[in-house]
């Protein structure tokens, strides 16, 4: 009996070696293996720390730059819109600083989604896309006009989240740190300020449905998209750390702002209207929450996009800069395409001004530049690869106007061009092999 008691006293933790008398609890496992309460607690802490590290690793892929560095990167790709770039740089930095420091904070920081207001073609989508590229986070674009309230024909708001999951290659942890840009947000305003007995399923109903995911909640997303039904499996995603950027042209909002600040329009003079259009960015910068509510946004929605920024209407000078200055400028892209065929492409200054003028007159902004450029370049892109005597293609003002074809400079001897083409052809044949 004494020996049995002595053996029991000698039982020790198999991990730390402490005896039963030195710990509060000693649990027995198979094969005379024991673990004490202190080692259990230590194991729990290690597992929890590794789990937190895994979550942090998903977020650690975020390339968080300082606001000034973010703006400097934006400057390489986005022409003009200085105020908007500054506001977005600060807001995005604060959002991801909150995300990366969340477990170390003793004060809960609420996320600040962003509302961008600006005319068509002012660069709203492009700015949001460039921000995601800077930060190395998944990015998805959703069209608010396709959304309807649950139970009606159209897309559920959860389908927006499926797009960010797909952008992250179904890596849910990574998707939860992404950026979602909701375009045409001004098209889901309620139809009337007065309460109606009929449901507004594509206006106020969509705004109501968006509230939860904007604020942060765990949403159930159908993996194949479409409508939910009770017998399908769902993907769970937490939207707390997803940054939502909403954008829209908000046509007519400037009149609400004018009425509030006391500016009056006199008569129907077209010149006055044109002057107001040039000043539309300044008016949008004075937008207050009550202006958005009067426009048709519900107060709860306005409260969930607290950061507002305005983008200016791009004038002809800005459009010329967009054609030439950014790292991925359209003219640089076309020059590279011609260079691959061994041809030098030259744009005359007057030609660029004409292309910018046509885009400005069409009121398509930066978005319309590529379509115009494509029509100007089409004949040359069709002929030049075949005609090996062409060394240079010059886009003149007349060719930009569509009055004549681009000027082609040919060599008396096509040898130089043929050598360049042989290199390309050789590379292509090797790739095929």
Swiss-Prot record:
Region (Disordered): 402-433
SUPFAM superfamilies registered for this protein in UniProt: Glucocorticoid receptor-like (DNA-binding domain), P-loop containing nucleoside triphosphate hydrolases
Entry keywords, A to Z: ATP-binding, Chaperone, Metal-binding, Nucleotide-binding, Zinc
Origin: domain of life: Bacteria
Key word Transferase present: no
Segments forming a coiled coil: none
Residue numbers binding Zn(2+): 13, 16, 36, 39
PROSITE patterns in UniProt: CLPX_ZB
Gene Ontology terms for molecular function: ATP binding; ATP hydrolysis activity; ATP-dependent protein folding chaperone; protein dimerization activity; unfolded protein binding; zinc ion binding
Binding site for ATP: 119-126
Ranges of residues in domain ClpX-type ZB: 1-55
InterPro entries reported in the protein's UniProt record: AAA+_ATPase (IPR003593), ATP-dep_Clp_protease_ClpX (IPR050052), ATPase_AAA_core (IPR003959), Clp_ATPase_C (IPR019489), Clp_protease_ATP-bd_su_ClpX (IPR004487), ClpX_bact (IPR046425), P-loop_NTPase (IPR027417), Znf_CppX_C4 (IPR010603)
GO cellular component assignments: HslUV protease complex
GO biological process, one term: proteolysis involved in protein catabolic process
Classification via PANTHER family: ATP-DEPENDENT CLP PROTEASE ATP-BINDING SUBUNIT CLPX-LIKE, MITOCHONDRIAL, ATP-DEPENDENT CLP PROTEASE ATP-BINDING SUBUNIT CLPX-LIKE, MITOCHONDRIAL-RELATED
Function in brief: ATP-dependent specificity component of the Clp protease. It directs the protease to specific substrates. Can perform chaperone functions in the absence of ClpP.
Subunit structure, as described in the record: Component of the ClpX-ClpP complex. Forms a hexameric ring that, in the presence of ATP, binds to fourteen ClpP subunits assembled into a disk-like structure with a central cavity, resembling the structure of eukaryotic proteasomes.
NCBIfam families: clpX, PRK05342.1
Family, per entry: Belongs to the ClpX chaperone family.
Name of the protein in question: ATP-dependent Clp protease ATP-binding subunit ClpX
Organism: Lachnoclostridium phytofermentans (strain ATCC 700394 / DSM 18823 / ISDg)
Gene behind this protein: clpX
